[in-house]
Amino acid sequence: MRIDYHNKEIINKIYTHDAVFKGFDYDYENNLIQFEMVEGYYKKRFKFIFHNVFGFKMASCDFWGKCLRTDTWHTADENEIAEELTEIKEKKRGKSEDGKLLESKSRLNSVEECVESTLYFISGDSLTIACEYIDFEEIRLAE
């Protein structure tokens, strides 16, 4: 299933509670983040691929003790990471010899809206990713 800005509310309806997070892979060259989670009670595997990643942040403090299980996955109403990056982009624009601002060459320019979502863990930690779109797959495991 493809999730983008226009259908991002789907994220709030996907039940990932107690799925075990297996770590993530960030492919810098292709701007991808991918990971899988396995949920034992309902016997499901979840596959996530975040495309055209603009930024991500993670809290990894084990606030309530170490735990790889997830609590929830939610989308944000406001794209904090994208807004922060847009501010940085504007500050970093150079000026031409006549004092005019140069055009930004940022990948942010190529996307109308991005989708930002946060995966919350039982430990109190979180992983927030801002990207163009997400490919999400829910697979039923054999009994």
Residue ranges and their predicted role:
Residues 1-143:
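Surface-exposed, interaction-prone regions used to assemble/regulate multi-protein complexes
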